[in-house]
Every structure is written in C-alpha cells, then in structure tokens.
Amino acid sequence: MKLVSWNVNGVRATLNKGLLDWIEREQADVVCLQETKAREEQVDVIWPEGYAAHWNSAEKPGYSGTLTLTRRKTLSVQRGLGGLLEDKEGRVLTTEFDDFFLVNCYTPNAKRELERLPYRHKEWDPAFLKFLKRLEAKKPVVFCGDLNVAHEPIDLANPKTNERTHGFTWEEREGFSNLVAAGFVDTFRTLHPGLAGQYTWWSQMSNARARNIGWRIDYF
C-alpha cells in the first residue's frame, strides 16, 4: 500500500502547476494534502480515475484545510478532533480503512512572534495526542502531514540560530517527543537515523532551497 503526503500551499495553485499529473505518476492508494486553502465547491476538478475526495476546509476563506484522496474503500470519515478541541481551521481529517485509521494533519503554526505557541503547546498538541490514542484503542493508527516542527537538531540546517524560532522551540519539540513517547514512530528517522540534510520545507528567501537550507517538518 502506498501513502503520500504533501503540503500544497494552495490546492488551486498547485492544480495549475501539475498536481493531477503528479497524482497520476505517484499511483498512490491514498494522497493526503495539507494547506489546501479552498472549499470543495471552489475547486473545479475531475480527480484521476478511482479516487474519492474527502475535504476538511477552514471556515476562514483561503486558509488552512486538509484533503484526502483515496482509492481504497473507506469505512468512515471524521473531521476534526472528535470534540476534544474545536477545529474551525480544517486541520485534521481521519479516514478509516479495514485495518487502520489514517489521520491527515496540518498542525497550527506558532507564528513568527510565537503568538500561537501557548495554544499549540497547551491545547493543540495534548488534544491531538489524546485523539490519536483514542483511535488507537480501536485499531492501528497512521498519521501524516505538516506538523510544523523540526524535532531534533538534525532535522534543520541551522539549529543553533533557531532555538526560539517557531517550528523549533522546546515547547513544539516537546509536543513531538510526547507523540514518540506514546509509541508513535517517526518513520523517516527510524529508517535513516543519522541522515542529515533531508528537508521538506525551505524559506523562499536567500535562495534557501538551492542551498538546501531547510527544515524537515512533514512526517509519517
């Protein structure tokens, strides 16, 4: 079974840049997209044959949102955190299959001045972990998406200069550590424990992508 995940930073813009061709090439069983920035009715698209589309869009127009495309039979679809915390931003979308749950997640960004860090640390991260454990009591859980945190120094190019930068604060890293302590596995780091320079996000400034000055903030 093949699962893929991508923060598209706007599904409408990404459709114009070849999203459908990419989906066709990947031939994944399930495609999880984050930061869709659109409602279903705003997107005029015919998805590749065999895929069913499940949306969780933000109430605020053009903001956040998740989308899961699946070719596998889906038993149920759940939006949000099951009542543990209000999700008006379309950040969590859970699809249930015969033998596991798949949780597509776009974790809130703490913001440049860390104004959302208290919410992230005290409310979101604990509620998300509790939600996952509640699901896990029923059947195995796979979760993926943009978690907006580089967990360890190896997961970003410049850890020393970013210790109080959003995405690498001790509070955000602790939230991820709690997921690991609860038994969830960072798949990439488990397979490649010492491999540095592997990132999923680069700033648009200072030619960062060409120089590979990046962060690994997206996970399975």
Q: Predicted regions span which residues?
A:
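Active-site-proximal beta-strand elements of phosphoester/diester hydrolases
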Residues: M1-N9, D99-L114, C144
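N-terminal, active-site-proximal structural segment of metallo-dependent hydrolase catalytic domains
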Residues: M1-W47, A58, Y63-S64, N178
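Catalytic metal-binding/acid-base residues of hydrolase active sites
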Residues: N9, K37, P108, N148-A150, ...
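Structural motif corresponding to alpha-helix initiation and N-cap regions
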Residues: N16-K17, E89, R173
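Short amphipathic alpha-helices and their capping/turn segments at secondary-structure boundaries
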Residues: L20-E24, R91-D98, A127-K139
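Metal-dependent phosphoesterases centered on the DNase I-like endonuclease/exonuclease/phosphatase
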Residues: V30, G50-A52, W124-Y219
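Structured beta-strand-rich core segments of catalytic domains in phosphoester-bond hydrolases
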Residues: K37, Q42-R112
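Surface-exposed cleft-lining segments at the edges of enzyme active sites
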Residues: G82-G83, P108-D125, K160-T165
